[in-house]
Structures are given as structure tokens and as C-alpha cells.
């Protein structure tokens, strides 16, 4: 069936901000869908609230709306654009839920819009737990024994049937949100209450426990003519009980016999037919009991998912692109496989001659109070994938690509300590983020594979593979370097051992080991990912390293530029940096360079095989990058676009003779090294907050006395404000030095005077060495002290005078030229009174670059990449700062709901996972839309509770006056109420939590409050008010912890609920006029 001609325009729903469970894989799928549909001649309309995505680039769709993915906003877009069809399968759970809302509210029917890719009934059948259960029984497949509950009474009735432990999963949520495993009644009630609260349909599925069962996934694609292919089978290394997004996974499945594989293959096809997925990709999850072989279907997703991004990258088969084309009527046999250059049709099942391992990346260090045990609710924030010829090789490559300080199966436990045995037992029994390293330690301690299997449920096959690696390590430890000959070195490298790990085992430096290996002439070769196990030729350069005979890299002799990506997502380094890498690749390819991407994150657009000319799917370690450089001999390497990951390699790459283009590693060091930075600030006669670098506790106490409290304290060289705190007095400083960091000569601690009540600013600029152009000045809404990645910001600034902005421009230009920046640079400044302080300078791509580029209609990352390759800003015609004639607000999105027990207060340590953008004619409108995009519901009336610290009291009466004018009743604690009453306003007093009942938390629990403005300072007051913030989060009450955000909310509420939607392309056209 060729493509449909009865539809002309298609609306694609994006996935919105990055949250745990829904990350950049949906930017990857959405961007592919946009490209696929436009090349077929359709008009594409896109809605996505996340500005850091490639899919929201104005060139990706015909009409782009950076608007909230809520049915109300999308309805306005449908009314304006009149699309013929909507494609909801590319934007994760967010898009599916939005599509179902549009259907339910009659919007699709009213405007005659058809749902393609999956219809409402299919989505409902797959997502509604009771319908899915019945559908599986109809085709003779088993689901886990389970029951459905819509209330606590029903839940208790199901529990009677199933007993403990049981697994609770809310309907229509993703990443297992709100679910969990209950081992006793108390846990059961807590999880069920939370689950009923979070499920949009107030429905829970309560399952028998399958903990310890083996878990598999099948990635399936089906078309209208019932052609089905399995793209890839995926096996979970961790058994059931750990969410698949948090499991180590391996593709293809390693421990199935062919017969078992065929049974599962047939079952997954039957599931797609029964649910009615006719066009596109789905994944089906299975559990198998290791003792009896009983197989159950756990769930299916009728959409492109996290696993399909992994399967696409693992096989080279572009699932999202194919799914988009099937949705418009094509069949698999009509579509060509790009990787083989059209030599095979898309109906060929991919076959692969290598092993892929995915490891999750966690961020528990950011949330010390979070429960770090892994259960059925997803907690990881990113992932890394590695390709090798054997499981051992791909596992060890993935371990070093994860960037958690391990270069392989490094030891975690001191086996000589008396606690060792009990630590190992606990870590093996209850899975945590680092279980695989504990498994290795258990093997070192003499535990047998059987004993480990009994504690972990990890398949014996995997354990035997790991045991072999540990035995090999023990052998290497006994040898001298000279004893390792060419054959033995090859054997070790084929098992995936890194130079660094071998050097540690031999007690020598990495450099010496690498020299020895090169002397033996042991080098990796590069193999191609070609979807067909080398049966057909491929022109696509999608490569991975391994130690074999034949190298398939065939590098060209063109001028090449290599871009180092950011590795796995984590808090503080996410999709924004990937966006910059993609833009660099696109710009330099346009300019005639051959572009080479090195990265290991399977979720991203940068690791798509057609983003750059050549893709090396390799860990970002010195060894791996140097080997790629050895083969490719690039003319220049860009290290400034992938966040801290490639920057950490800059110096060592330079020493090894790799040509780094753009800002020099020495200039980067001048900006990062405190003492060198201070000299520069003084030389330019600029201001910075009084500060000191200390190397012992005594020194710290002395320095603190002369700088004056409050202080910002942190270890040097960190990204995302790791272990950063504000301390208000001596005892707090001592506690920080004791508990949070080990201060020493090698790891100094930085003290800065904290600028209380200051307005923070962020500036992005491009410099070519002689000219500097400001990309944008952004004003933070939260005052200084909140990490810049967590603060909302406004572009242009909404309350800074022209004089202040001009002075900022002068200072930024001075610093760019003094540092010799070539490329991008980001500066953070603070305004206190009438003084401007420089807080920090980063001569690299920052996380605000995508947001700024969307606001000013010009890609800073592209311009800067061209500058790094030798162009001047004058040649590029970018000489003038572009100041938008509309307001844009960027708002951060947080994962607090996933981590009960964590305080949702903002501070100097970054905690957000993603961002959204709101656009409006006024600051208030833009802020209101950003809140809506972040799924924060702004109250329109009711009772506002206000309690602020002394420093905020001068502003509090103004906020109260606004709220009363907007129809709110104001309640406040004694100190705050006094100030409001003094201004002649009506206020009701309420007890603080520490002053006896009824207090404010009682009001929250009784749903008597609709808005909370609660600001604190100092450890004690933060601890006292913790229950206010946590309860507000549980009761979904809008709560802000800064007075500045309180003022912004008043602006947003004045704007009122009537929304207009704006095309990005129209906004940009207005800037050029």
C-alpha cells in the first residue's frame, strides 16, 4: 500500500521535558519522525515544550509550537493549524495521555482529526490494565496473577487473594511512577495511596510477585498487511523486581535456546495482533520462571519507547523513522533499509554479529535522603551503551563508559574488613545502583556462582562470564609487565580490559601500559554496525572497536573534525550538550568537513547514524578517544560541546598531540582554576565575591572569619554543584568539613561569600578571538543561591535596568578577549544593590545554549563551531546581539515525586532533570505557560500561605497585596503576618509547625491551602519547614521556596487563563524584520 493521499498535514506530539523514565530517546524518535514525514511531502506540525530538543529546531517541522503538551493548548493549535491527522506514538507516555485527552474531550472529532500510528482503542487496550489482562487470556497467554483496584477497599480485597510480596502498578503512568513492591501491610497502604493519587484514571494493578524471574523484551514492528519483524531481543541481566529502565540489559538475548526464542517471538507477534498495533513499533516484556519455565506477558507499550531507542542503536535499524512511514500507509516491504544503501528492504529482520550492553546511570548522590534501592519504579537518569564482539568485551566497555570512576570491575569493598561479608550479602540481596561491582567483589571473596545466583537471581551464564574476568584479573596481578606478550595482551583486550584497569592491576601508569601495548603492535580494529551481519555491503560508517584482524574503518583523506559527545545523561549534564554536538556536526558538514562523532549514549540524536558522516560508538575515555584519533587523524577535535566529560580529557589529548580547536585547554584551565581566575578578575578590575581556597579545617575556619558568613562551600572542579552548600555559621561549617567532603592538599575546598538577596544573571556569548557577540542576557527568577540549572530564567531580563545590562555586556566582552575564547562562553554574574559580581566563567557550551538559540532564532552552537574551524564572526554575518520582542521563560523540572523523603527545596546543588519553555508578549504570560509546561498547576484562588525569612520581609507585603487583589485569602505565620498587617492588609494567622496545632501542615493535609510561599535560611529553619514542602508535593499544592518566584507567580496570575499559541517560525520572522 503506497502512502496515503487523503491526508496532507500531520501533528506530532512531543514528549515534553526530560524526566526520569522519559529522556532524550523521544527527541531522537520525534526528530526521525519529522524528517521521515517531510521527505514524503507532508506538512508537519510539531508541539513540544522542551527547548533543548533537536525536534523543536525551526527547520525540523513546517510549524513548531514550543507550548505545554496539555490537551487545552494542543486544542488551540489544532484549531489554528487544522491538521488532518495526529501521530501520538513518538512522544512517550506524555503524548499518548494527551492524545487520549483530546479524544475524550471531543477535540479530534470536532476538527475532524484522525489518530494515526495507534488509535485510541489500541492505546487504551494496551494501557488499561484490566483490558490488557483480558486480551492476553483471549489469545492463550498468561499474565501475572493480579487484581484491579480503584480504592483502598478494593486493593485490600486483591491483597487477600495474592498475599505478600506483591507488586503495585498505577495505570497510565510511565517509568513505574507511583508503583513499588510491598512486603508488609504498612508499605502496601503507603504505595497504594500514592499510586491512586498519581494514576490519571485512579486505577491500580496489583500483581503477584515475580521477583527473581528472568525478564526479556522483544522490539517488534508491524504494518497494515500484518508483516511483522522482530528488530531485536533484549535480555535483562537483573531479574524481575528491578524496573527494566534500571536494569543492565544485553542484546541479543544470551541465555535463550532457539526453541524458547521462537515461542517468545510468536507470543510477541500475537500480542501486537490482539492489541491492534497496525503501524509501527512496540515493545513486549516477558517474565520467565527460571525453575518451571512458565512464561508470562508483563506489559506492552503501543509506541516507540526507551527500549526501541536502544534497539535502534543496537542494530542500526531506525525504528522511529520506519514507524512514522508505516503510520502513513506504507508496508515494510516497500521501505528501504538506509544502512545497506537500499540493498535490503525494511522487512528483513536485522541480524547482528556482536553483543550490546546497556548500563543505567543513577544520581543518588544528588538526593542523599532518597531510597537508593532499585524496585519497580524507575530511578536512573541516563544510560550508556557499548558494543563488543563478546559479552565480556561489551560489559567492560560499558563499565568504563559510565563515568562513575570505574575503569572495569573495580573493587568496592575492603575484603579484609570484618564487615565485608555482611556488606556483600546485603548488596547482593537488595539491588542498588552498584550491584554489579559488589558481585565482582563477592567472587573475589571466594563466593561461588551458585551462592551468588541464590542471592541475586542473576542468570548463571552471566555470572560465569564475570567469574572468568575476575580470574583473569587475579592472574594479571601476579605478572610483571614484561611477561605480557602480544598473544596475552590480545587475549586481555578481547575480554574488554581497559589500559587503565590493566595498569592498576600491574601497579604501573596508564601511559606505560599504552606504550607497551603499542610496542607489541596491539591496536583495536573498527567494525561496522550494518543490520545484516556483513551479508551485504554498507556505506554507513557506524563503527565500534574490537580486537580482531580485519579493520572496516576505511578512513578517508578529507579534512575532518571530530566532536566528542557528553556520554550518559546525568543531572547537570544532559540533552542540552547533545543538542550542541548535533549542531556542530550539522554546521561543519555543511561547510564541507567530514564530521566524526564519538559518543556512547544510545538515547540521543548525536548517536544517530546520519547526524554525522562517521559515528564511533565508543566510551569517552582517553584510551578509546586516542585510538579513534590514531585511525582517523582528524584536523581538529572539539571538546567544548559535551559538558565536563570531554573537557576532562582536553589536557591529556593535547599532550598526546591531538589538535584541539577552539578555546585552548590552557584558557579553560584559567577559567576553572580559582587562583588563576582571581588574578584575571583583578587584572580587569572587576568584582568577585570575597573567597578563599582552603586545604585544612584550621585554614577554613580562619578564612571564614575574614570573608564573613553566610558562605557558599564546595569542592573544586564540579559540574552541577555537587556537594555544594550554603553555611550560615561556624558550627555548620565544621559539620560540612566533617561530613560532606574530605578536605586535603589534593582536594581543596572553596569558600565564597554568599551574596544574599542578589539577582543572578546568565550570559551566553560567542567570540572569535577579536570580536565578541552577546547571544543573550538572561535574568534568573530565583535569587542567587539556587543553582543556575534549577532556576527559572527570563529572556530578555524582566526587571534589570538598561545601565546594568550595558555594564554586563562590557564585562563579558573584556573577559572573553582576555581569556582568548574561540567559540562559546557562558558567564554567571550577580547584581547586589548596584554592584555587579562575576560568579563564574565557563569557556564552553552551556546548558542555556539551546534555549537562547530558540529565543533569538539563530543557532549559537553552529556559529561557534564555524568560528572554531577558523571563520570570523564578520564572515558569518553575526555581529549584533539579537534582542527578542517577546518574553521567553525557561523553567526547570524536578524528580522529587520519584524520591519520597527528599526535601523539594532549591539550593546550590543542581537537582533538575529537564526544562521547558514558555513564550508570551509579557513576562507574566511567558511565566504562566512555562509553569503549565512543567505540569505545575497555578491556583486561581483560595488560600495562600506565606511564611518568609527576615531578608524577604521588605517584599512580602507587595506579594500579599497582589494576591488579595487576585481574590486569595492570605494566611501567614506570626512574624510574616505582622509585616503584612503593618501595610494595612487583611491576614489570618496560623501556627508554625514548631508552635503547636492546628498548624500549617494540618491545613495542607485538609486541602485548605492552594498556594504556598515559604522561604527559609539556615539548617534549622530548613529542617523545621521540611514537612510543609513535602506535604505540599504530595497534595499537589503549588509551593515555591523563594520570594522572587512568589512575585513572578503574581505576574502570571494577573495574566489570567486565556492562552494564545505561537508558531516559533512566526516569532523568528518577527526578529529578522
UniProtKB/Swiss-Prot annotation:
Pfam family for this entry, one: CPSase_L_D2
Cofactor remark from the record: Binds 4 Mg(2+) or Mn(2+) ions per subunit.
Residues where ATP 2 binds: 714, 753, 755, 760, 785-788, 828, 840
Required cofactor names: Mg(2+); Mn(2+)
Stretches for region Oligomerization domain: 404-553
Gene Ontology molecular functions: ATP binding; carbamoyl-phosphate synthase (ammonia) activity; carbamoyl-phosphate synthase (glutamine-hydrolyzing) activity; metal ion binding
Region annotation Carbamoyl phosphate synthetic domain: where it falls in the sequence: 554-935
Keyword tags: Amino-acid biosynthesis, Arginine biosynthesis, ATP-binding, Ligase, Magnesium, Manganese, Metal-binding, Nucleotide-binding, Pyrimidine biosynthesis, Repeat
Region (Allosteric domain): 936-1073
Role: Large subunit of the glutamine-dependent carbamoyl phosphate synthetase (CPSase). CPSase catalyzes the formation of carbamoyl phosphate from the ammonia moiety of glutamine, carbonate, and phosphate donated by ATP, constituting the first step of 2 biosynthetic pathways, one leading to arginine and/or urea and the other to pyrimidine nucleotides.
Protein name listed in UniProt: Carbamoyl phosphate synthase large chain
Organism name: Pseudomonas putida (strain ATCC 47054 / DSM 6125 / CFBP 8728 / NCIMB 11950 / KT2440)
Gene name, Swiss-Prot/TrEMBL: carB
